[in-house]
Amino acid sequence: MGNGYFRTSQTSSSSRQREKRGKDSYSYQHNYVDRVRLEDTTGGHYHNNQHQQTTHDPRCPQLRAAGWRHTHKSVSHLDLATSCHDAAGTGLGRHSQQLHHHHSNQVNQHHHQQQQSHHHLQHANLHSHHPHAQPHWTQCRVGGAGSGNGQLRNARSLDYTQLEREENALDIAEFYWRFDAEAPLDQVDSYAVLPINDNFEPSAATSTAVGSKETTTTVANKANGSATTNATTAAANALLDILGSESCSLRRSRSLAVIREETFSDLQIGSANSSRRRSQLIPRARLVNRGFFRESPRSRHKFQFKQFKKKPPAKLLRLNGKPNQATLVGEQPADQPTADDTQSQRSNSATCDSHQQQQQQQHQPQQQHQQQQHRLSGESRDFDVYYDNLKRLDALALNLSEQLHPWHNDKSDLESLNSDYFKNSLHQNHLDQQQPSSLEFEALEQVAASLLKERPRIYQSRRQQQKRNNHHSNCLQRHLDTGGESCPEHSQSSVFPETTTSNSDDQTDSPSLSEQEYDLTHIEEIYQQGNNGEESYEIISLTTTTRTRFESSEEGEEEQTGEEVVDSLTTPTEPQTSDSESTLRQNHNEQLDKLIAYDSVYLSSEDSSDCTLVGESCESFEQRTFTSCGESGELETRSLLHISIEDTVYEPQAKQHKKATNQEDQPAPLLTTTAKVEAQIFTQVLKVEHTPKPNILAVVEKRKLKQEEVKHQPPELKRQATDSFVVTANKSNLAENQYHSLPDVNIGVSLKVCESIDKELRSSYNQQRQQQRKEAKKEQQVTRAETYDSIRRFGRAHQKARQREYQEREREREKEASAALQEKDKEREREKPKINKEFSAQERQIEVKETTKSQDIIKEKEQVSRKEEAEDDEEEEPLPPPPPPLTEESQQEDTVADVEEEDNLSVSISQPEQPKEAPVIEVANFSKLIERRAQEIRERQEQIKPSFQIIVTDAQNNIIQKEAIQENKETSQRIEPKPSPKTNSNSSSTCNLVQRPLRRSVSSSSGKPLEHRILSTGAPIYKARPVRVLPSSSSDSSFSRGKMSRPQILHVVDGRGGVAGGGAGGTLRRRSSARSIASTISSPGGEVANEYLQKVDAVRCYWNKLAGNEPETLKTEQPAKETQPGIHFQLGGETTTQGTDKSAVGNDFCSMMPHPSIEIVELGEGAQKATIVKAAPEREEDPDEDQDQFDHIRYKVLKSQQLIRNNFLSTRNKKEAQFDGLIQYLQEYSFQELLSNNNVVIVEPVRTKIERPLQVGINSGSTTTPTTVPPPKPPRVVNASASQPRKTRQKQTGGAAAKRHFFYQPVRVNRELYEDELPDPDTVRNVRRFFEQNVLPTPGQGLLVQSQQKFGGSACQLSPKSRRARGYRYLTIDTSYGGAEEQPKGMEMLEEHKAKHWDNASLSSGISSGVLSSPCGEYHHQESPVMACKDVHVQDVVRRHNSNAANAKARAKFASRRTWCMGAGGPGANESLYRQIYENNLGNSEQQENGEHLEEEDDEQDDQYEDDVEQDMCENYYVSNDVLAKIRECGSTVTYYGGRVLDKTATSTAAPSTKTTQPMTGSATRSRIRQIEACNVCLPSERCEHRLQTKQAAAKQQQDSYQGIKFKLVKSNSCSSRLELAGTGEDEVTADSEVVRKMVHHFEANQTTASNDVQVTINSQSQITSTKKEPEEDVPRRQVTVNNHINVLGDTMPQASQEKAENFNGRPEENGYGAVETVPTYESQAMNIRLDATENKNILQTAAATAAANKVCRNKNVDLAYTLVKTTTNSPKGKPIEAPRQKIGKQLREVEENVEKAAVTKATIKLTKGAPSQIIVPVDIHSQASIVAHTAPIPERRLSNASSSNSVVDKTVVRHYVANDKSIYERRKYDEIEFEEFEVYDPSKEPPPQVEEGTDKIPTDAELYDSLDDKM
């Protein structure tokens, strides 16, 4: 609602409703910080109200738009309380004045059915007479005078941090929009601060001064006697004023920001992403015109509706839900002074949308009768009381100080207010929260009691007022036309930053929120009552309708009133029998339901559940509307029509017919409803044209169409519109929020792009759905696709809401035209363009012309000519058709054109109205320019309308009458399935659009017009569009209504509907008509129009592919797309132009989001094909490999448009690596949510894109069947990152390079390293053989296969890395080990990645191999076959790779079976087979332990055979010291100890893997010690014995404790040793085995508590043993951070520094990840190990001294410890890439923050406490001094890593990253890109988080792994 508090409360109720809908995931934590904003509340509010379009933001642009932050930055609730005194006095005085005026207006409105235009004029006069007459509560001003300037505008600012967490960001935004929309500008300026003082005397004085209207008296007397009720009512009214008017204004800024925010939240992609969105949204948020346009006209209409609905209690209760915002003090006089009692009630209700509604629900029964008397003073006091309570609530729920500055980006503010206010107040304790909130429960009970008394009367009065409502519907229609533009006021230029869906929802926030609260009160009743289920769903539909209303303020008000009607209808229908209970319930539930309704509105937009509910209850909703039609169905009809407005360009008329048929008072309400629909359409259009606001054009015309069509709209059409709208609203929010859930790279840029595109698409969907609804009106059936379209259109309505100021001005126009609307709508329409000019909405003026004309025509022939109407609107919309049937057709088409203008805005439908739409779209930035252009075009259009019809016919490729063309267009655009072949193509596209446009609408719901979105996508497009709009306007001058622009947008529609598959007939026709119109109407502008249309088509095609299944088709079509126009989008393949657009869009589908759109526009300016061609080449620059991927990213990454632009747009191949990391993140984490929430099937294309790099990697070095697997395996999305790094190392081609920039630059470094140590072809062949035969083909071993496939072929990645070099193999093997635990699903891949990471870190490549080899054998014996087997396959594969690659002979003997230990612990099912393999190899490995070094070599050589393939994987060749030194020098992760990546064998499974690893480590250590003999750090036997024995025992004890990790930690006993694993030197590498053994022995025998030293670190690795196997090692383990970290392989494995640091922390086995989290000391090591994998980056983050050490300082101890760590690392490696990317990013951030390691910020993955693979390969090769130095911070780091990794890191992702040291590095690239999830594991920052966990935390392996899994 208007007031943030009630909005918050409403959000709670909405969240309740969402929970009912099954959207419990919504955390309604939107903290509406009540901001007192000193707003310049001059008397010009009336001026604004009258000249909403022109002077809507006289002060609002300054204060509202200028920013709440700078003006009301520190104003808090208390400030509101203080300022509320003045506001109470002033605002209530104004309330009385306005109430008085509104009372007369209400009286007039009672006659307004006959005097709709009169009412508008009277309303205008009212505004003129009383500048603050619009929203009653808006009149509460800080200044003492009625229009005191500089008043504190109180509004609850959204806490955008919470919003980012909030799925229901739209709820918040809608709440603010309700705030902003309800109050007129002046009132918004002045509504700031009434509420805090309960008995604020100025409030009462104002009420008294204003005359203590019946409302005030009623409020005062009814609530708490004159004083208490006045105080409560005055507080409520003051709150209504503050929150209603100020919230409107605030919500203009907030809803602008919040709506985009909410779009992000609705996207539910990432809570962490939302904050970024929030910050981007906040600057875009403007408080300028939203409240004024939404509040004053819409409030007036809403209030009129209330007054007409003379059921004061019920309606007021309902109005509390819905009209509270607008119908308080200001709106009541503004809307309907006639129905003063209803007005007061409504005003009260409307003002406190959620809380004030609650409060007034409490006071309503008492107040309702007294409200009219004491409405002004009582409302002022109620507002004070309410605001006091609200402030109290905010202080309670919100952490007052925080919530005060959500615009200051107080995330906790929204969090506290949203979560507490919503959850506590509504979800947890609605009544209890109401007590802390502004309304106390006592007052609520009082209001409930009085409402129980009065609610029946309210219902009766509603029924009595039904005819009034019909009149009021007419009046309200004009008001709503203005009020609908008030929504566009909300959707002014800053609206586009918001999400379009949010615009829809939030535009309807102030009135619609009230309605929604009514809706949700009714919904609550419905839910409570068995019969209420459908109605509650219908209320949800009304909630969606509310969004649509916000879409167009006239719709918003009308829908608000209609929502009230729905509530009244629904409530009378159901709770009439139980009116007392219902009243109480509505008192209570209305507060709850208001929130629910608000959330429901967002749910409607966000959730397909709302669509489902609509499916369930849409008919019931329609029935209820029909049933209530006699009572107050008119309002409900308007609501329904509002619902259909956004979603049906054509359907609004159909809806109106529906409603008209079903409602007794059909003519006026239906007419109003039709106007609503049209208004929404035009609102969106104007939103596009004018920066955010040109939607008013659609609003006015919608209303007129509604008002006229309402008479001719059958209930079926109404039903159709309602159903369609509800579904569409759901989808729009969902898609919109999904769109915004992208990681916030540059959400502002991406949002701009996405919003522009989405607005385009949404408008196109509006057009399509409107066509479908016209058709459906004829058919009189509402398809769910239409309903979804309605929801999408509803999202567009949010954009229109941004154009609310234009809608408001159009409302003023409609006020003038209201009287003559019924008489001469066309004349009015022609006059209104002048009015639009007057109101600085030229385009909207034209739209108003069309609206009036369309309304008249729709009245005449809405249902029959609905399709014609779309076409005729396009063709001759400004020009009234000369013959009556043609006139009806034309005007209906005009209405449709208004609707379609918005649709064309997004969809670029080829209807002549699209030319009108194009300037509308372009008005996003060139609003006035485009408006002028559009006016010229529309004037010409009126002149050239007949030719326009002809052009439409030709352009649609079907020379048909306007009727037929419109039908076809409607069929193609609106109807998902259409009989015509083109329509069938369009059906596929439209069905996709129904789902895709949902997302597109969501994207465009960002509040950006399509052009704005395109501008964001590519500034050139947007900039070019305005330029083209001017030529388009010149060419459209004949179309006289921006039709040139609209054909351009029609092209977009074609690009979306027709470019997909050549564009359906209608889409093709639309594009052709758009192009033909562009070229035919005016040759200069026509060319530009065609170019613009092609641009729009490219954008639309881009978004089509982006939106739904088409992206997959695009995947197939992308190469041919340039050549073949219609391959991908088979909707309209008929047209070559569409094909060209398709080519451009197909090629740009990925890059279109960032650049192709821009390129299309740039080229489009010069030539259509040039534009598309350029866009297509851009796409080709990014060939198929990235296109599908970016289909997803378009939704998600478009938010991060800057990321895409910086990376993807600017030669995506250059930055494709960074963007690939983002893409991987999106596809693995964000896109999953995005796709699941949006029902988008784009995940596969993204995966395919990622898989392409996988294919590249597979082709480069795939040595196993997984090579073939990666392309078809989306599960490998996670592995795609690791796999792609491998590919990058192997093949720095487009795909690999694309991923590499994020994850693979280190691969480049390693590539150099690998060039020297390329894997032997035999090793590659053996590994491939192994994978093909064992891993891939055997389903019993399916874990490995599945994991590989799931993660994009980590085995494949292993193979390429093996081929490339041992370093690649290292990472692969490490991943396998680390993922051993997690392997059940993809842990094998994760383990591979972990092992790979260890290899990259070059921990103790030889040592790890040797040590892990024997322990793996023993562990295999010791532990369950599954555990032993799981990690073995990956490690064996990698081992084979490594051993064959680097020193096949030397490494063959080296602990080839150590990998078995790694895999042994991890997988439960697949491990057994691999375990058998490992057992077989274990015998050999143990023999090798016995000293059979040559035997091992033989085994490794045998591994080259199939048996030996497995064994080769198991066996680790000796890596000569030279090789190790070279590896370490190269900075690659020397996982080769004995020429093998043995250190990767850190079993990410339980400690049993470590146990096995330790025994295997004995043999491997023997082999290594043979190498390490030079170092002589440890006796091979010591290590062998201790490791095999103590660690076997410890692994047995700590099977659940990641002893394998600890075993690795023992290897990285010392920082030097562990760093040596990162690459100390070949001697140290050799010493690693010995050092690990020796350190383990030292720690065992000496129990060195100084294990923090380098050697102690290796002992700490032994600490794994120390916990259970090696008691001696256990003590040092706790001490040794590296050991602990390695022990907690899953946790610290992702970061080598974490491994080492955790090893330092000691006792990682006991700690499990706790030990791992003691790695902070080794953060530099982790960084350096990463330097091994990615030397450059490691050096970057590692200390300068460590940089050299990274290569050379690989201590043997570190290598040994790292080998052990690698053994443990496996589990999280692959997985973190997948889901935990955000988690990993967060944890990594925590770890990075906590870790103070100077140089080792490069830890690959934050430690996942439960994932052993998080011991990161990138163990920095620090000197032991460095390592020791890091030992101190290790505890912090371990804790953070463990907690962060466990909670957030997906084991698979961790494995993936940990396995790939380059993955760690590329994770760094994600960090650079601001990826939360891909934040580079910063060892320097990680140790503190590790310390969180502390070395003491020694969970068992199961605990550690489980914790990781739990948080994955």
UniProtKB/Swiss-Prot annotation:
Listed GO CC annotations: cytoplasm; cytoskeleton
Disruption phenotype: RNAi-mediated knockdown results in abnormal bristle morphology. The bristle ridges are shallower than wild-type and become nonparallel and disorganized near the tip. The tip of the bristle is swollen giving it a javelin-like appearance. In 13% of animals the posterior scutellar bristles are fused.
Membrane-spanning residues: none
Record region (Disordered): 1-32, 89-145, 298-377, 460-515, 545-586, 764-920, 965-1010, 1257-1297, 1486-1507, 1881-1912
Compositional bias segments (type: Low complexity): 355-374, 499-512, 981-990
Keyword check for Aminoacyl-tRNA synthetase: no
The keyword Cytoplasm belongs to this UniProt entry's keyword annotation: yes
GO biological process, one term: chaeta morphogenesis
Cystine connections: none
Biased composition (Basic residues): 97-133, 299-313
Principal location listed in the UniProt entry: cytoplasm
Feature: compositional bias, Acidic residues: 553-566, 890-904, 1494-1507, 1903-1912
Location(s), subcellular: Cytoplasm, Cytoskeleton
Compositionally biased residues, Polar residues: 339-354, 489-498, 568-586
Ranges of biased composition (kind: Basic and acidic residues): 772-792, 802-869, 965-979
UniProt entry keywords in alphabetical sequence: Cytoplasm, Cytoskeleton, Developmental protein
The protein's role, per its UniProt record: Important for normal assembly of actin bundles during bristle formation.
Protein name as annotated: Protein javelin
Gene assigned in the entry: jv
